[in-house]
Amino acid sequence: MPELPEVEVSRLGISPHLVGGTIQSLVLRTPKLRWPIPQELKQLEGQTILAIHRRAKYLIIETAVGSAIVHLGMSGSLRILDGDFPAAKHDHVDLVMTSGKRLRYNDPRRFGAWLWCAPDESHEVLGRLGPEPLTEAFNAEYMMDKARNKRIAVKAFIMDNAAVVGVGNIYANESLFTSRLHPLRPAHSLSLEEWQTLVANIKQVLQVAIKQGGTTLKDFTQSDGKPGYFAQELQVYGKAKQPCPHCGEPLCEQKIAQRNTFFCPQCQH
């Protein structure tokens, strides 16, 4: 599943080709992804793309008449093409520019979304979201206050979009390992110093992942079709029973909040 770094990598990859350009047409090859594709998106035709933002794992393609909100779901990807190449089986949406370039959306599992948001309105999918993890609003004091009286596992807590957005499963595992924190620790039990360490490591892990082009485990590719290379940096994710890089103890795997969790029983407390 594309997480925040993969979505940010996609934004950085497509923006130079699209922002400031004019949309010639919108090609819809399916009426429905996770939700029905709204016909209001056709209003994009003839409009100039003013900016492409990211909020959590949503991309927002902004024009004067409204915005397209794009979510990659479990297996979605965006590519920039330099012409009208034949559509493959799972190519569901094309945003065709007057320059001849086109943004193509591919999604084998169809859990992604293309939505519409009118100007000066906020779509419901963007409501009740916590701060962005790479901003100053995400800090140790905020997280300690947010975790007060929260007995859920710290891993589940940092993956809750109401607390902080975009800390997906891969990066939660890696950040907790780097911080030497056990993923099952109750969120309220972390000290301010431990929150300072964890917040700093979440920021660092996400920044490195973005720099490396994200993590390609199966479906994700960058906008130029290349894979993300952060998979080569993973220390614990997907490495159950392999030796811990710090102490050599076999790494454990356990389900926490229905997500595969990897940790060292010796190093993480």
Curated annotation (Swiss-Prot):
Keywords tagged on the record: DNA damage, DNA repair, DNA-binding, Glycosidase, Hydrolase, Lyase, Metal-binding, Multifunctional enzyme, Zinc, Zinc-finger
Cofactor binding remark: Binds 1 zinc ion per subunit.
Renumbered zinc finger spans (FPG-type): 235-269
InterPro entries: DNA_glyclase/AP_lyase_DNA-bd, DNA_glyclase_Znf_dom_DNA_BS, Formamido-pyr_DNA_Glyclase, FPG_cat, MutM-like_N-ter, Ribosomal_uS13-like_H2TH, Znf_DNA_glyclase/AP_lyase, Znf_FPG/IleRS
Catalytic residues as annotated in Swiss-Prot or TrEMBL: P2, E3, K57, R259
Recorded GO MF terms: 8-oxo-7,8-dihydroguanine DNA N-glycosylase activity; class I DNA-(apurinic or apyrimidinic site) endonuclease activity; damaged DNA binding; DNA-(apurinic or apyrimidinic site) endonuclease activity; zinc ion binding
One Gene Ontology biological process: base-excision repair
Pfam family, one: Fapy_DNA_glyco
Name by which UniProt lists this protein: Formamidopyrimidine-DNA glycosylase
Taxonomic source organism: Vibrio cholerae serotype O1 (strain ATCC 39315 / El Tor Inaba N16961)
